[in-house]
Regions:
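Long hydrophobic segments that form regular secondary structure
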Residues: 132, 136-144, 150-156
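Metal-coordinating catalytic core of metallo-dependent amide/deamination hydrolases
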Residues: 1-130, 135
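Short, acidic/turn-prone active-site loops that include or flank metal/cofactor-
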Residues: 17-19, 94, 151-155, 180-183
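Hydrophobic beta-strand scaffold residues
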Residues: 12, 88, 147, 174-175
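Histidine/acidic-residue-rich catalytic or RNA/ligand-binding cores of hydrolases
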Residues: 96-108, 136-141, 158-167, 185-202
């Protein structure tokens, strides 16, 4: 994929993601070891990563959803990101079920779990961030954590609508729009995503929200 993006001449910032724990949707065959993930990520960074501003390829690392992984691999992810000076990406507060899982198992909200595990700050950016309460909204702003809203995917999965006006008012500066992935959206058009984001926010938060 990285070679194909280079050949096409498009900007591509891939993330070496992983699953470290089996579940109903994660069979044992796709579970990665810490050594395998970190070794592969370092290989990709050394081969393709260009740290310069506006570069065409910057390689990152990150779990799909951090609190579904082992704490050991999350810690190793942060350590490697600091060592190689690369970004960390994943999903945060996408669904109500996700919030309920974190509250039940860890006794806190999703963004607070991320804070406790050093997963917020300039190095980090997360997709969705729908089900954040007021304190979490401010936490994202105070830590300068990046957010990427994925409205088409969120509508397909009935996940909800990202609180974009509240996040911007709170002071979130690193804000973008994403398409999520083929498993949750059948469109990879950024222009369509921008159009839908505008309409969804007007529907969700009012005609003066964007």
């Amino acid at each position: 994929e990285i070679e194909a993006a280079k050949e096409l001449g498009i900007r591509f910032h891939p993330v070496r993601s992983y699953h470290s724990v089996t579940s109903d949707i994660v069979p044992p065959e796709v579970v990665d070891s810490i050594e395998g993930v970190m070794g592969d990520a370092e290989r990709l960074v050394k081969k393709y990563h260009d740290p310069s501003r506006f570069s065409m390829c910057q390689v990152g690392i990150g779990p799909s959803i951090a609190y579904y992984e082992t704490e050991e691999i999350v810690r190793a992810t942060i350590d490697l990101a600091e060592k190689l000076d690369i970004k960390v990406h994943g999903h945060l507060a996408e669904s109500r079920g996700e919030v309920a899982f974190v509250e039940e198992h860890y006794g806190c909200r999703p963004a607070e779990w991320f804070r406790r595990h050093d997963l917020l700050g300039d190095r980090f950016y997360y997709a969705h961030c729908i089900h954040l309460n007021d304190e979490e909204v401010q936490l994202m702003a105070d830590t300068n954590t990046g957010i990427s809203t994925c409205p088409i995917s969120n509508m397909y999965l009935s996940s909800g609508s990202c609180r974009i006006p509240d996040l911007l008012r709170a002071g979130v500066k690193r804000f973008g729009i994403g398409v999520d992935g083929a498993a949750s959206s059948n469109s990879a058009s950024m222009m369509e995503e921008i159009r839908v984001s505008y309409l969804l926010n007007r529907l969700s938060w009012g005609d003066d929200s964007i």
